[in-house]
């Protein structure tokens, strides 16, 4: 598993991401490596403290078969989607769009967009619409993404 992030754990992450208060200020990749190794000391992990850009995306992600996108920023999501679909034809992309707010969790779903692009979320809600991100909807969208990754590994490509 390859983990890539440039950000540090902030108090606003604790209610919806898998970090602990003792990890505040740590780089997210380092904190997540620690947490995953507590769960499974045999896991193979590669961590990069980096911001994914047009210039480095292919290099950073070339070792992955499946790319699971978890950006906050819509422009970054679009950049990664465009890069993977246009320059990495052997990769699957599982992305997320629309998990903010207090809408029903039943609106979150996963769609197969192309033979190697899956999109999880409600495709409508936006963090700027008011209430922001709430843990249950974020967790459900992440679970959709994780399950889609497992299905791709199992060669079950339909949703």
Predicted segments with their positions:
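Adenine nucleotide-associated cytosolic modules
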Residues: 1-159
